Structure formats: structure tokens, C-alpha cells
Design a protein with these regions (language model features):
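N-terminal secretory signal peptides that target proteins for export/translocation
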Residues: 1-13
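Sec-dependent N-terminal signal peptides
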Residues: 11-27
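Short, surface-exposed loop and linker segments with low hydrophobicity and enrichment for Pro/Ser/Thr
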Residues: 17, 73-84, 155-158, 244-254, ...
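Generic detector of N-terminal low-structure segments
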Residues: 20, 33-35, 413, 484
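C-terminal segment of classical bacterial N-terminal signal peptides
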Residues: 24-36
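Signature of Gram-negative chaperone-usher
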Residues: 36-192
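Negatively charged
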Residues: 191-486
């Protein structure tokens, strides 16, 4: 009797085929773009699936021991779009069930309602999984597509992804074809073309090359008009820039101009040594004015030596600088000998690891606000304030030195500047954390006017060891060169 029942069931279901009509890949280039004369940004996006229609024999599924099956669809995507792409999945309409093509038959294969493993799918339901995810998700409707993948950069090579359709069936289904259509949409992410500056050392080399024995640069700023051919402008954009950036010198007003079609210029990740005048002091040492207001520094990681040796600049406005990604500020302002005003109170230094020589040899600076400095990741503070002879006080109350390994010559003064020394007080909130401090040679060399909060000092300050990096408390046998901030 059981065999006869099985034969009847087999005949009834032999014509049940489940059709999955996979919709055409929707390939859309969705990025903003304005025409320019340099290099039109052309993003490409290709996407394909290995089949347009997935057919599954329902009889085989029902007669299997698990009454389940999986069907894999391979999705291939590649894009040159710099912000990547987004792939979504949905049905063509808000109907998520597989419906019998005979409208008189009302049985259907419904979407699962919650995440489930294949073996735990309810009878006569289906779902999908993506790539390595073992569990199956409810089939998404047109009004609420599922986000399969979202990338943020261009493809290095063709990407391969797998969409699996999982079903669980039983004999209660009526014979016939059950269908639905899935839409896989692959869309490039929005992208706005950008002007990106060349690397700092290359910019510096090109800026220096503008000068001659008679024509010197005294100003640097953006031009509102493009250069003419007679100006012999040179290109200073990065190879990944979507716009051309031109640089030239106008000898009449002694100004180095740059021009770009966009309002903003993104500085290179490596913006080190951009305005370095050179250790020989022969190039771009006469600059008196820098207009950096159109520079976006949000992607910069290296500002080491960025303004080093700019000996004639007296003020520097960096209020527009975003330093949230910067790790290297070593020697950033070193040897700016005539600088009298430096406002870096807006700096975010939370990622900085190197501040060595950052303010070294700024002889004429009388005040330095470091109240917002976050030094929690800094490892090298050597020579950080060396030869700053005109500071009378230094407020380091916000300093965290727990990771610092080197403070060699951190506050030192050269023998030649000893008579000009004015530093008397260093304010802190707590003793310096010297747990990881290894290099500390000559930290306070020649700082003979410096006193701790209770008057402690050494006849030869260069002999101070790391125990002097604390709040002065001689009454308890703890002399130090620091004063507790009021």
C-alpha cells in the first residue's frame, strides 16, 4: 500500500518545476560630475550573473530525505569607481512568495519570516543567503530591498559573490510551475571628483624651482583665473587627482599662484616638507604670507617638517586645518625663527605619534597654547621645545606621556641662546608618566632660569634625570621642574 501511494505521489509531482526568474542586472553609474579640461573622470562598472533563470525540480526536493535544497547564483562585479558600489536584492514586486502560474491554484511557497537555517525552514517556504552566511534570510520585497554588499573603494580585481536560494517543500503543494522574479541591483556609489595635491616633497621641489637669483617668492595664494601659456605653469596635482592644479610665479607681485577649477584642494596624505625652505636657506626663505584657506587636510597623515625653516613668516593661520588623521608632526614648525603668532588651538592631535622638534628653534614666539593637545599616542617628544628662548611659561597641563619613549633635549637651550632664555615655569596637572621613557639626555640643558613650583632647580640643568619630570615638592624629598597648574 505504501509503494502504491509513493507511485501516485511521484506522478502528481513530476511536472512541478520551480522557476526563479533572475532579473537583468541593473547597472547604474550614480556619481556627480562636472566637465573639466584636464582628465574627465570615467568610472566603469560591470556586473553579471551566471544564469537568467534558475529551475529546480520540486519532485526531487520533496522526495529527498531533508525535503530541502539550495541553489547558488554567482554574481560577478568590478568597478573603477573610487567610492565602490552597492548591491541590493529584492523581488520585482512586493509579492515575495513563489506563486503557481495557474491562477486557479492558490497554494504558494512563501518567504520565511525570520532568519533560519536550511533544516529549520518551515514547510513550503524559501529564503536567501549571501556569501559565507550559512543561515537564510527572508526574501526582500521591492519596497524594502536587502543590502547585499557596500564597498567604499574601486575593485582591485573582479569580485565573486554567491547568492544562495534555500527551499523546504512537502507534498501538500499542488502540481504546477511556481515563479517569482528577483532583481539584483548593482549601483556605483556617489562620487564627487576632487582636486588632490601632489606629495609634499614633490610640491616643495616644484615650488622651489620657481625661484631664480632675481625672482623670489614672498606670497602664496590661489588665483581666480587660469594661467596663460606664457606663464610656464607646472602641474602639482597627484596622479589620482580628477582635476589639474597649476602653479606659477608672477615676478611682478612676487606671488606663487596656484589654480584649480574646484574651490577646494585636498592635500596629499603625505604633506610633509611642503613649504620647507631647505637646510641651506637658499630657497623660498622669503615667504611672508601663506593663504591656505582653500586646502582640505582631512586626509593628511604626515605633516612632518611642513613649514620648517620658513624663517621670515611672522604669522601662520591654520584655523581651517583638520588634523584628525595626522600621525606625524615632527619638525612641523621647526626653525620658524621670526614667527610671533601661532594659533593651533583647534588642532586634533589624537592620532599623533611623533612631535619631535615640532616647535624647535622658534625664537620669537612668546606664547604657545597647547591646552587642547592630546598626546596620548605620542612616543617621541625629543627636542619638542628646544631653543624656544622667548617663552616665559609653558602650559603642558593636558599632556599624557604614558607612551613616550624619548624626551631627549625636550626643553633644552643651546649655549649660544643661554643669555636670552626667559622660560621660568612649566605648568602641569600631574607628574609626567615616565613608564616607557628610555631616552632623556639633556632634557633641560641650559635652562638656568627654570624653577619648580617651590623653587627647586639644578646648578647644571642638563644633569636632570626623569625624576625631575614632576611637580616640585622638596618638602617631601621630591624636587621637580614642574609647577602644579592653579
Amino acid at each position: 500500500m505504501e509503494r502504491e501511494k509513493s507511485n501516485i505521489l511521484s506522478r502528481r509531482l513530476e511536472s512541478i518545476i520551480f522557476m526563479f526568474l533572475i532579473g537583468l542586472i541593473s547597472v547604474l553609474l550614480n556619481f556627480t560630475f562636472s566637465q573639466n579640461s584636464f582628465a574627465e573622470y570615467k568610472a566603469t562598472l560591470s556586473a553579471s550573473v551566471n544564469e537568467d533563470t534558475a529551475a529546480i525540480d520540486g519532485t526531487e526536493v520533496i522526495e529527498s530525505s531533508s525535503e530541502t535544497t539550495e541553489h547558488a547564483i554567482n554574481l560577478k562585479v568590478k568597478t573603477t569607481n573610487k567610492t565602490g558600489y552597492t548591491a541590493t536584492l529584492s523581488t520585482k514586486t512586493d509579492e515575495t512568495a513563489l506563486l503557481n502560474t495557474n491562477p486557479a491554484i492558490t497554494t504558494k511557497i512563501s518567504s520565511i519570516s525570520s532568519v533560519s537555517s536550511l533544516s529549520n525552514l518551515p514547510a513550503n517556504t524559501w529564503g536567501y543567503s549571501f556569501n559565507t552566511n550559512a543561515d537564510f534570510n527572508p526574501i526582500p520585497a521591492l519596497s524594502a530591498p536587502a543590502n547585499l554588499i557596500h564597498t567604499t573603494e574601486k575593485s582591485i580585481s573582479e569580485e565573486n559573490h554567491t547568492i544562495k536560494l534555500g527551499l523546504k517543500l512537502n507534498s501538500s503543494l499542488k502540481p504546477g510551475n511556481y515563479e517569482n522574479k528577483l532583481i539584483i541591483s548593482v549601483v556605483s556609489n556617489p562620487y564627487t571628483p576632487k582636486a588632490v595635491m601632489t606629495e609634499g616633497p614633490d610640491f616643495n621641489s616644484k615650488l622651489e624651482s620657481l625661484e631664480t637669483t632675481t625672482d623670489k617668492i614672498e606670497h602664496f595664494k590661489k588665483s581666480t583665473v587660469a594661467p596663460t601659456a606664457s606663464m610656464n605653469a607646472m602641474n602639482i596635482e597627484d596622479e589620482d587627482s580628477d582635476y589639474e592644479i597649476k602653479l606659477w610665479l608672477d615676478p611682478a607681485d612676487k606671488t606663487a599662484y596656484y589654480y584649480v577649477e574646484t574651490e577646494k584642494v585636498y592635500l596629499n596624505e603625505d604633506s610633509s616638507q611642503m613649504f620647507l625652505s631647505g637646510f641651506d636657506g637658499q630657497k623660498i626663505e622669503n615667504i611672508l604670507e601663506l593663504d591656505l584657506s582653500n586646502f582640505d587636510t582631512s586626509k593628511v597623515t604626515d605633516m612632518g617638517g611642513m613649514f620648517r625653516d620658513m624663517r621670515n613668516l611672522t604669522t601662520l593661520n591654520l584655523s581651517s586645518f583638520d588634523t584628525s588623521q595626522v600621525t606625524d608632526m615632527g619638525g612641523m614648525f621647526a626653525d620658524m625663527r621670526n614667527l610671533t603668532t601661532l594659533d593651533i588651538s583647534s588642532f586634533d592631535t589624537s592620532q599623533v605619534t611623533n612631535t619631535a622638534l615640532m616647535f624647535a628653534d622658534i625664537y620669537n614666539l612668546t606664547a604657545l597654547d597647547l591646552s587642547n593637545f592630546n598626546t596620548s599616542k605620542v612616543t617621541d617628544m625629543s627636542y619638542m621645545f628646544s631653543n624656544m628662548s622667548n617663552l616665559t611659561t609653558l602650559d603642558l597641563s593636558n599632556f599624557n606621556t604614558s607612551k613616550v619613549t624619548s624626551m631627549s633635549a625636550m626643553f633644552t637651550l643651546s649655549y649660544y641662546d643661554e643669555l636670552d632664555d626667559k622660560l621660568e615655569t612649566i605648568y602641569v596637572n600631574n607628574d609626567f608618566n615616565t613608564t616607557n621613557l628610555t631616552y632623556l639626555y639633556g632634557m633641560f640643558g641650559n635652562r638656568k632660569k627654570l624653577r619648580g613650583g617651590a623653587g627647586s632647580f639644578l646648578t647644571d640643568p642638563s644633569t636632570a634625570d626623569k625624576t625631575w619630570l614632576r611637580i616640585d615638592d622638596p618638602a617631601n624629598g621630591r624636587p621637580g621642574y614642574f609647577t602644579r597648574k592653579p
